[in-house]
């Protein structure tokens, strides 16, 4: 296993940035084809070190790339000028192609995230479907409808108006904006474009459970194929470690198959 910590100057973020990359010792088991690549997006208050990327890379023989998104919700923040979505979906993809020969096409490039990173994975995949062919999102912070119409001085117990305004822009119009994954995926469907294969999960004891159920229902009502799974679990690394392995197996391993809508029975 090769572990690399790579530093380069990001035009999207206007500073030097660092990402972690893991390459399996065995390399690519599919002959001369380029190695498949998985992007891992961390959650709120986290960083690239939150992931056990080396375990996934070694077991399934793909490259793992873990960037740092700070607390920016992996969005192009209109108020801050920090373009985290552009950084991942354009700049980092192109850097990996030029420098390492990775992430060459959507069929072999996937993105996965948990919590804030789950939101970011869905949003990034829908914003750049030509780059990402599959997306896995765990315990996703799908909070658009909660923060819509928040007023200055208000807080939801996690963060305040100023923070959300910095990440999402105008909260009066956020539900119909480019920051909303629902808007992006619906546009792909309406325009007849390829939608990335979608894998989602959430724990039945997770405080974001209803948010994830609502997005699952939206995808069903919009007739967008996806897999949605629930099982006992909280908003923590135990659940994310279990499902990162499960989804990697489904996306890369012996359980690979055509995605169709599927959900397990709800509990409680």
Regions flagged by a language model, labelled:
Residues 1-268:
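Non-catalytic cap/lid and distal C-terminal segments of serine-dependent acyl enzymes
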